[in-house]
Amino acid sequence: IMVRNYMFRLVQLFALEKEDRLAELLDYLDEVPDFGAILDDYFDEYDDIDSGPEARGPEFFRLGDTDSRAWSVRQIIKDPDGDHAYQFVATVDLDASDEAGEVRLSDLRVEY
């Protein structure tokens, strides 16, 4: 549940156009996506981001293999056209998460 909440928090901040807060939240990563540029691209295509209850549904979240200490996750952004082209794709580092006491990613990218 923590991982799912964390990934959806990224969607919420993205929907609110809080690129500085996103960068701050992820400042421990070696490479942080250029959220300003990604937001510009998104809003060139779409007028809005759905961050309501339906956007939080299981059809917009994917958890890969959980047999290792690194989990692949995908959070799909629910756009008004139903394209679902924009997606947060990350690897959750369980060892770093245990040490930090909160979800820690080893990488994050935005696919579109």
Regions from the PLM with identified roles:
Residues 1-5, 29-50:
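Long amphipathic alpha-helical scaffold segments
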Residues 26, 79, 95-97:
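Acidic surface patches and DE-rich sequence motifs
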Residues 39-87, 93:
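Surface-exposed, charged secondary-structure patches
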Residues 85-112:
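Short beta-strand edge/turn micro-motifs at domain boundaries
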